[in-house]
Each structure stands twice: as structure tokens, then as C-alpha cells.
């Protein structure tokens, strides 16, 4: 049974918060227990505060009119006799992907609010599934798009929401129609983080600070800051820089709204905090950070986490010509950067 927060879906013109679903349940057995989940959109799955996802951007990017993929998780040993907290955070993925009419995603027949279907099983018996016993609330993610970026307001966080049994501010979900596509188990290599890269240089501009991560790559930012409530931080990502900041010409189109070209926004709460986007992905060498002070503009403020499918090498290449070696290195990094499933 598929459930969603509602029928309204996220667009550039009208932002809709990513929904967080929650269910409290008891489990008085230590037998084999599994969770099967699929989503139209993307999901993050949490059990008693721990994230279960095997992969970034789960379950798999697909056209839900044709194929929808599901994942299975073995949760034996992770359950309590009483008050287990199961949470599902949904993002838009490709179901609501804005592309400024380049590939006509805006008019796709499958466009809808993100939704998911889940079964919790003990052995072969389904104990419960996604239904109206799940409750739903807005998450602090106020906008998410796989390419355009993500916007997050830390002041909307619900304290300890992934572990607390409190259901205050949660309401009933909407039971919705299933997708048209065939349901298939996901057997692809997971999308994983490949280290974390610090800036090799930081340069002040008229509007902020440019962080140079040394090479073009794909992935997500990791922001760490001590801030005051309400401080707004804008993160713009690009492959090149111009005279007054990052240059989007290699990654945008004539119709593009530049406020939605690889642009993340983080609204701070009080104190020390960290942020990594959940449902977006950027290709860049440079990040322009706006809204921070000179004291905050340190290398520790922003790092970059390369993210790509977990694909291994089957051979290595090395020769006595350093130019050729460098070209091979760049080519391999470019190949990995373009493999998300």
C-alpha cells in the first residue's frame, strides 16, 4: 500500500517540504525480521535512530511508469520488545525533477508527490505495512531537487525525532495509487561516499568566499558551523569561476533560473551544527559560500564528499609520460562522477 503526505508536489514555483513518516511498534521476538521498501522518489530509512540505507539516493533512479525498484533490510538484533521507532524520509528524486524543459521532466506523466510502500516481516509473515498507522509531518527540508539543490531550515527540526516516541505535530497520511511500473528488486551496486575533500584554497569575493576543492568531481557538501539562529548560508556549486564568483555557463542553460542551478540553502539554528543534503547531488570543483563572516570562512567550514556508485577497478595504468598519466586519472574520475547507478 502506497502512502504520501498529500497530493501536492514540489516545484520551483511552489516549494513543498520533504515529508517524514513515523510509526511506533512493539516486537516480542528475535526471529528473522526484514523490512522491504520501495519509493516513487527517494527515501532514507531509520530504525530507532539508526539509518538503514545501503546507498545514497535509494532505491534506484527510474521511470516509475516502467520500473520501480525495492530494497530489503535484515533488522534482526536491531529491535526492542517495545516502542521501536521506524521513520521514512522521502525526497523527490526524478519523480519531480526540474530541468527547465530540457528533457521535459516538468510534464512527465508520472509526476506526483513522493510516496512509498513498506512491509515489515517476521519470517514470511507480514506484521504490518505502510498504511494509516504511519503518521507524517513536514521535515526541515523545505525544497529538494536532484540537480537544482536542497533548502534546509534547522529551526524546523523536531528534537530527537528519529528516536522519540512522541507523535506531536504528526498527522494522517494519504493512501495513494501505486505506480504503473513493474516492481523489481534492486541489485545495483550502492552509491557510496568516496572520502572527504578539503578546500585547497579559499578566495574572498564581493558576495562571499570561493572554496576551491582542487578537482572537478560529483557529490555533496558537508557544512560545519557555529552560528546564530536565522543566519542564512547560500552554497553555489560550479565547475569554473569568473571575475565575480562561480561561473555556471558550463552547467546551465538559457532558460535556467540561476537560483536553482546547484544551489543549496541552509538556515542556521543556534550553536554548533552540521549539514549534509539528503536528496541532491552536485558536479563541481568550486563552491561559493555566501552569508558567512570572515571568522567563519575556514577550511573546516565546508568540505566536499565525492559520491558515486561503488564500482571497482579491473586494471591499472601507469607509464613514463606524466601528461598521459594525468589524462587517465582525469578520465577515470570523470567516469566515476557520471555513474550514479
Show which residues each predicted segment covers:
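Extracellular/oxidizing-compartment recognition motifs
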Residues: 1-341
Amino acid at each position: 500500500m502506497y502512502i504520501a503526505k498529500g497530493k501536492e508536489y514540489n516545484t520551483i514555483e511552489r516549494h513543498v517540504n520533504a515529508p517524514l513518516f513515523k510509526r511506533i511498534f512493539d516486537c516480542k521476538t528475535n526471529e528473522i525480521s526484514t523490512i522491504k521498501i520501495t519509493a516513487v522518489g527517494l527515501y532514507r530509512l531509520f530504525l530507532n535512530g539508526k539509518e538503514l540505507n545501503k546507498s545514497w539516493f535509494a532505491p534506484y533512479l527510474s521511470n516509475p511508469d516502467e520500473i520501480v525498484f525495492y530494497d530489503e533490510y535484515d533488522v534482526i538484533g536491531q529491535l526492542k520488545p517495545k516502542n521501536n521507532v521506524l521513520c521514512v524520509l522521502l525526497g523527490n528524486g526524478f519523480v519531480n525533477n526540474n530541468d527547465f524543459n530540457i528533457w521535459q521532466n516538468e510534464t512527465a506523466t508520472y509526476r506526483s508527490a513522493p510516496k512509498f510502500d513498506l512491509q515489515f516481516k517476521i519470517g514470511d509473515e507480514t506484521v504490518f505495512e505502510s498504511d494509516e498507522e504511519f503518521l507524517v509531518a513536514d521535515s526541515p527540508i523545505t525544497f529538494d531537487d536532484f540537480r537544482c539543490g536542497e533548502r534546509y531550515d534547522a529551526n524546523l527540526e523536531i528534537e530527537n525525532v528519529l528516536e522519540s516516541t512522541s507523535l506531536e505535530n504528526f498527522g494522517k497520511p494519504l493512501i495513494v495509487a501505486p505506480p504503473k511500473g513493474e516492481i523489481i528488486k534492486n541489485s545495483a551496486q550502492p552509491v557510496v561516499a568516496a572520502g572527504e575533500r578539503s578546500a585547497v584554497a579559499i578566495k574572498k569575493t564581493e558576495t562571499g568566499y570561493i572554496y576551491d576543492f582542487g578537482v572537478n568531481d560529483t557529490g555533496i557538501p558537508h557544512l560545519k558551523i557555529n552560528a546564530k539562529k536565522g543566519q542564512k548560508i547560500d552554497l553555489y556549486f560550479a565547475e569554473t569561476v569568473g571575475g565575480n564568483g562561480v561561473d555556471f555557463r558550463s552547467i546551465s542553460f538559457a532558460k535556467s533560473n540561476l537560483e536553482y542551478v546547484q544551489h543549496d540553502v541552509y538556515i542556521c539554528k543556534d550553536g554548533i551544527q552540521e549539514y549534509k543534503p539528503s536528496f541532491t547531488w552536485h558536479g563541481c570543483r568550486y563552491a561559493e559560500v555566501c552569508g558567512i563572516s570572515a571568522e567563519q570562512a575556514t577550511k573546516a567550514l565546508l568540505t566536499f564528499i565525492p559520491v558515486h556508485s561503488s564500482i571497482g577497478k579491473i586494471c591499472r595504468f601507469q607509464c613514463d609520460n606524466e601528461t598521459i598519466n594525468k589524462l587517465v586519472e582525469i578520465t577515470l574520475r570523470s567516469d566515476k562522477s557520471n555513474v550514479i547507478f
